[in-house]
């Protein structure tokens, strides 16, 4: 019992598993006031609980401060949805991402939850990074480069990055970007500022939690809304 309680405190978003929700109306994942819909997993805080928070609310925005590195994860699991985010880098360009289908925490490099990342890294918004999961795209040989002897996959040492279609859809630094992610079954489609930037199929998973990264750069989010899919 004592061990189970300790594990729950260390990795609160792993268990118990919540029912999987398919949205029927728009839901604001961030309510503008608090982080009651989220749980943070910041590995460095295991050894130093006094570290500053990685995620704060400032001026009505959700802010990923970038460090200490980690993830802010929804309490709820979702499937078949449209996720719209509006974000901007506040200082220097840098790295961040939205993770969909998040499940097992710290599944890669003792940091990243098992998931499929939709990249927000400056200049590369819309790349996929697979984390102990997988997905396929057209032109795999071209868009998923691998070194000799390297295989496609989501584990350490695998070719995990899948290049986007544009690398030119982001707005200048400091301006707000809109990223839309649609999840239909095992397909994931991504738009940045109206441009189609990625479309993957045959994902290894079709549901899970949603996570925001703290990965070195400060990023503000003024909108994180999940809702039903539009008609095809």
Model-inferred region functions:
Residues 15-232:
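Carbohydrate-interacting regions of secretory-pathway proteins
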Residues 3-12:
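Sec-dependent N-terminal signal peptides
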């Amino acid at each position: 019992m004592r061990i189970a309680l300790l594990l729950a405190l260390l990795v609160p978003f792993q268990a118990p598993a919540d029912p999987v929700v398919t949205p029927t109306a728009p839901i604001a994942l961030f309510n503008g006031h608090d982080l009651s819909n989220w749980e943070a997993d910041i590995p460095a805080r295991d050894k130093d609980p006094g570290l500053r928070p990685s995620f704060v609310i400032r001026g009505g925005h959700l802010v990923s401060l970038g460090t200490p590195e980690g993830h802010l994860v929804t309490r709820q699991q979702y499937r078949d949805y449209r996720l719209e985010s509006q974000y901007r880098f506040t200082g220097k360009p840098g790295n961040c991402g939205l993770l969909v289908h998040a499940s097992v925490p710290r599944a890669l490099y003792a940091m990243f939850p098992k998931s499929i990342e939709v990249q927000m890294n400056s200049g590369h918004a819309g790349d996929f990074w697979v984390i102990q999961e997988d997905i396929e795209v057209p032109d795999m040989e071209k868009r998923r480069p691998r070194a000799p002897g390297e295989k496609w996959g989501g584990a350490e040492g695998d070719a995990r990055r899948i290049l986007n279609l544009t690398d030119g859809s982001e707005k200048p630094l400091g301006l707000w970007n809109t990223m839309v992610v649609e999840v239909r079954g095992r397909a994931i489609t991504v738009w940045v500022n109206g441009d189609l930037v990625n479309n993957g199929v045959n994902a290894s998973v079709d549901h899970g939690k949603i996570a925001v990264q703290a990965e070195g750069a400060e990023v503000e989010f003024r909108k994180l809304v999940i809702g039903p899919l539009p008609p095809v």
